[in-house]
Amino acid sequence: DGNIWGGEFFLFDGKTMERAGHLEYLPLPGGEASIKKPYRIAAAYGQYLLNEIPAAVFPREYQSELELISKQLDSGFNLAWTSSLGRLFDAASALLLGVCPAITFEAQAAIALENCVDPGITAKYGHQIIQSDGQSIVSLKEMWRQLNDDVKNGIKPGVCSAKFHNTIVDFTLAMCDNLKLKSEIKTVALSGGVFQSRALLGHVQQGLLQRG
């Protein structure tokens, strides 16, 4: 559809595959070039979802770049849209752990986010699943608002990271529940780089097994 996919839910009946849902589309300033600079993604998500870029997260030397990102969102110039879960991890990592000038290896930001998880935290952020054109869309505004509030209130990164991971698990299981009711398909396949995360994969597997 001209957008960058990456947070998709498909139904496969053995013959045909149907895209049944996805994460909501969020802006990616500069397109995939932003992958190397996760703070740009965090700024764009904050501006788009909350009309707020938390200035405390970004040093002063980044202010001119943040202003440019804001103008890109207003004009749509050199702006891609993505449903990527990997980019959501990148943005959350930048928001929680601070600006990393440039990524030097694949999944660097997501790995840093996983490494700081407080395993004793079971709380999670909110989310909403909405229906649009026959598809289930995971709305991320409430999750990002609560995450942003935690950062502003000085909640420890390990707590926020745990709540973020728990939220991903929660909406993944909720989407699987919805698609099971729709299709009666009970087998789930998990793929993509984000499921290299032990914190994420283990909890999703456990939740699926509990659901049968």
Locations of regions flagged by a protein language model:
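Short, intrinsically disordered, charge-balanced linker/junction segments flanking boundaries
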Residues: 192, 208-212
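Short beta-alpha connecting loops at secondary-structure transitions
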Residues: 18-34, 72-77
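Active-site proximal loops enriched in glycine and acidic residues that flank catalytic Cys/His/Asp
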Residues: 11-13, 27, 164, 168, ...
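Gly/Thr-rich phosphate-binding beta-strand-loop-beta motif of the actin/hexokinase/Hsp70
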Residues: 1-12
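A contiguous, well-structured pocket-lining segment that forms one wall/lid of small-molecule binding clefts
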Residues: 41-185, 199-209
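Short helix/loop capping segments that flank catalytic or ligand/cofactor-binding pockets
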Residues: 2-3, 19-20, 92-93
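Short acidic-glycine loop/turn motifs at beta-strand connectors
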Residues: 11-16, 96
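Flexible loop/turn segments at secondary-structure boundaries
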Residues: 1, 30, 91, 196-199
